[in-house]
From Swiss-Prot:
Gene that specifies this protein: aroC
Source species of the chain: Helicobacter pylori (strain ATCC 700392 / 26695)
Cofactor note text: Reduced FMN (FMNH(2)).
Protein known as: Chorismate synthase
Pathway: Metabolic intermediate biosynthesis; chorismate biosynthesis; chorismate from D-erythrose 4-phosphate and phosphoenolpyruvate: step 7/7
Domain of life (superkingdom): Bacteria
GO terms (BP aspect): amino acid biosynthetic process; aromatic amino acid family biosynthetic process; chorismate biosynthetic process
Family stated for the protein in its record: Belongs to the chorismate synthase family.
Length: 365
């Protein structure tokens, strides 16, 4: 399927080397001021070609809004938008058009659909994630109206872990590093991978918090069984190319702890810790929502690799083209956008949780 969300639904379309990619965001309430500067900035954060640590492919990534906006406000109807592909180079893939690139989706897409779109991976390309960032910008505009902000940064590259988290520094960092002291070592790890015609994995940290420092997030976003907030977050993140694991709060470390070590104790002011990552019973508990997203190394590397062609013959694959040496860097921005989309969807879902909410709306009329 090509749709994310239930009440705020994003449907995406397009391929890496097609004329356009785009999306339809359905369910956006009317009356939200469209922040074009925010939209442009979000696209630039994900944009390639900015430095040596990401792909050289630099698309303009101008978002063309085709519907759902009138006089700079959302109308309540589906927001349609297009992003033009202007710098695709399909010739870079001529030498591998009948080969399966190791650890790419070529193999599974071919066997599922019987079509070999060799041009940059087609629909399975990370190029599609630009649509999610654009849609995430609209979701952020909605969340801002109720005091919620999403942030992201890199906490690990090639096993080099951040010891401190500074989201303001991440905005200034070429690799969105959260720890300024570890940034140079992380950059060196990427540069060494590039020198060796290789790639490297990484981990992004995504969080949602209240815009005001003295306030909490809304309690009760999500539902207790089949629309659990943490499940929907994990689903959205795992749907992104290259993501191999998602943790909420302490995540994997939770399995190593005793209950007395893990439990978030409480007093009259609230929780004394946040090992749960802001989610209890599938619903937000008011604390910051903390998500860690683990990315595999980019499968596109410039080393000879053993593979097979579409006829099953063994052969050697040597790639050309423009690729991210570490997909976690730009991927962190996409994950931030996905968290915004999930939270906006849960905010709209929550309107049905109490009759008082409906009475508030309809008694005013």
């Amino acid at each position: 399927m090509n749709t994310l969300g239930r009440f705020l639904r994003l449907t995406t379309f397009g391929e890496s080397h097609g004329d356009v990619i785009g999306g339809v965001l359905d369910g956006m309430p009317s009356g939200i001021k469209i922040d074009y500067a925010l939209l442009e900035n979000e696209m630039k954060r994900r944009q390639g070609g900015r430095n040596v640590f990401i792909t050289p492919r630099k698309e303009d990534d101008k978002v063309e809004i085709t519907s759902g906006v009138f006089e700079d406000f959302s109308t309540g109807t589906p927001i349609g938008f297009l992003i033009h592909n202007q710098r695709a180079r399909s010739k870079d893939y001529d030498n591998i058009k009948n080969l399966f690139r190791p650890s790419h989706a070529d193999f599974t897409y071919f066997h599922k659909y019987g079509i070999r779109d060799f041009r940059g991976g087609g629909r399975s390309s990370a190029r599609e994630s630009a649509i999610r960032v654009a849609a995430g910008a609209f979701a952020k505009m909605l969340l801002r109206e109720i005091g919620i902000v999403c942030e992201s940064g890199i906490i690990e590259i090639g096993g080099i872990k951040a010891k401190n988290y500074d989201f303001n520094h991440a905005l200034k960092s070429e690799i969105f590093a959260l720890d300024e002291e570890q940034e140079e070592a992380q950059k060196t790890a990427i540069q060494n991978a590039i020198k060796n015609h290789d790639s490297i994995g990484g981990v992004a940290l995504i969080r949602a918090r209240s815009i005001k420092t003295n306030q909490k997030l809304p309690i009760g976003l999500g539902q207790g069984l089949y629309a659990k907030l943490d499940a929907k977050i994990a689903e959205a993140m795992m749907g992104l190319n290259g993501v191999k694991a998602v943790e909420i709060g302490k995540g994997v470390e939770s399995s190593l702890l005793k209950g007395s070590e893990y439990n978030d104790l409480m007093d009259q002011k609230g929780f004394l810790s946040n090992r749960s990552g802001g989610v209890l019973g599938g619903m937000s508990n008011g604390e910051e929502i903390i998500v860690r997203v683990h990315f595999k190394p980019t499968p596109s590397i410039f080393q000879p690799q053993r593979t097979i062609d579409i006829n099953g013959n063994e052969c050697e694959c040597l790639l050309k083209g423009r690729h991210d040496p570490c997909i976690a860097i730009r991927g962190s921005v996409v994950c931030e956008s996905l968290l915004a989309l999930v939270l906006a969807d849960m905010v709209l879902l929550n309107l049905t949780s109490k009759i008082e909410y409906l009475k508030t709306i309809y008694n005013e009329n």
